[in-house]
């Protein structure tokens, strides 16, 4: 009797196959750092002959870049005192923290604030599996602050992620606000200047208009007087023409006698005066409308007699 191939797969063989599969999976998923130990050494990447400067009263910090594999090492800071490196005591003025990102990790030492006694040489050391690794030294030069040293910027709490008790504002953050305020005030100042110029021009024009009004009124009064004078003369000339029309029928001798008698009577009243006689002729007005209505009349001339 022949056996079926499906009957060869027994529970025992299936269990052995599953164990073999798990072993292969664990080998393939093992960390590459576990297989290659040389590429996974702890490194402290502080540059040789590093030096930093600070002023007393500043919030200061120094960093120790650390490269490690899986387990993070125990990192500490120490300060050199002669031939020894004394570990630093963490307190309110000195504290440490880890700063990690995608590219690298760093163990940071914070001075809040830094004092003149903090001047010296500092070293970062890492301890992993009883193996101690020391970094290069960092020299910190602390200078006492005076009134002339206020131009140096301060490291504030905005630069330190773990500082929570910092109360001083950042001077670098205030400068952009002042520049934007200056840019906003410039258009306002120019608009106020233009408004002042427009108001000044309107005021000058109003003064000139007030000065011109009296001169215009005087000129108009003179024109009206000049226009009114010919009208009165025309009315007198019309009256005279109507009166002189009576003497047209008289003979020349009677008119001479009457003129002599009138002249003699006037001279007796005023012996030292001068008698003027007006010419009786029509005066043509300035306006063409009034001149068209006046009828021309004959002109009479009178003699003037002067006696001393």
Swiss-Prot record:
It comes from the Eukaryota. SUPFAM superfamilies: Immunoglobulin. Keywords: Adaptive immunity, Cell membrane, Disulfide bond, Glycoprotein, Immunity, Immunoglobulin domain, Membrane, Phosphoprotein, Receptor, Signal, Transmembrane, Transmembrane helix. Residues 30-183 are extracellular. Disulfide bonds join 40-69, 64-124, 78-85. Residues 205-308 are cytoplasmic. One of its GO terms (cellular component) is plasma membrane. Phosphorylated on Tyr residues by TNFRSF14 and by antigen receptors cross-linking, both inducing association with PTPN6 and PTPN11. N-glycosylated. Residues 1-29 form the signal peptide. The chain crosses the membrane at residues 184-204. Residues 32-134 form the Ig-like V-type domain. InterPro entries: BTLA, Ig-like_dom, Ig-like_dom_sf, Ig-like_fold, Ig_sub. Inhibitory receptor on lymphocytes that negatively regulates antigen receptor signaling via PTPN6/SHP-1 and PTPN11/SHP-2. May interact in cis (on the same cell) or in trans (on other cells) with TNFRSF14. In cis interactions, appears to play an immune regulatory role inhibiting in trans interactions in naive T cells to maintain a resting state. In trans interactions, can predominate during adaptive immune response to provide survival signals to effector T cells. This is B- and T-lymphocyte attenuator. The gene is Btla.
């Amino acid at each position: 009797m022949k056996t079926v191939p499906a009957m060869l797969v027994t529970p025992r063989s299936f269990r052995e196959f599953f164990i073999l599969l798990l072993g292969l999976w664990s080998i393939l998923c093992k960390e590459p750092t576990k297989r290659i130990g040389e590429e996974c050494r702890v490194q402290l990447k502080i540059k040789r002959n590093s030096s930093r400067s600070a002023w007393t009263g500043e919030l200061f910090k120094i960093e120790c870049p650390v490269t490690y594999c899986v387990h993070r090492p125990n990192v500490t800071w120490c300060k050199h005192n002669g031939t020894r490196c004394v570990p630093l005591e963490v307190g309110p003025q000195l504290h440490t923290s880890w700063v990690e990102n995608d590219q690298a990790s760093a163990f940071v030492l914070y001075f809040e604030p830094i004092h003149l006694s903090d001047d010296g040489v500092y070293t970062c050391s890492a301890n992993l599996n009883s193996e101690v690794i020391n970094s290069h030294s960092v020299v910190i030069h602390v200078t006492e602050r005076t009134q002339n040293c206020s131009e140096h910027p301060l490291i504030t709490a905005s630069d330190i992620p773990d500082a929570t008790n910092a109360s001083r504002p950042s001077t670098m953050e205030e400068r952009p606000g002042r520049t934007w305020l200056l840019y906003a005030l410039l258009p306002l100042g120019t608009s106020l200047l233009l408004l002042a110029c427009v108001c000044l021009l309107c005021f000058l024009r109003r003064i000139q208009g007030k000065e011109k009004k009296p001169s215009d009124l005087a000129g108009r009064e003179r024109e009206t007087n000049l226009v009114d004078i010919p009208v009165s003369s025309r009315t007198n000339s019309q009256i005279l023409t109507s009166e002189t029309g009576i003497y047209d029928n008289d003979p020349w001798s009677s008119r001479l006698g009457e003129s002599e008698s009138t002249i003699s009577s006037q001279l007796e009243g005023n012996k030292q005066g001068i008698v003027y006689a007006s010419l009786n002729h029509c005066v043509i007005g300035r306006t063409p409308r009034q001149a068209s209505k006046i009828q021309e009349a004959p002109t009479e001339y009178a003699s003037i007699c002067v006696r001393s």
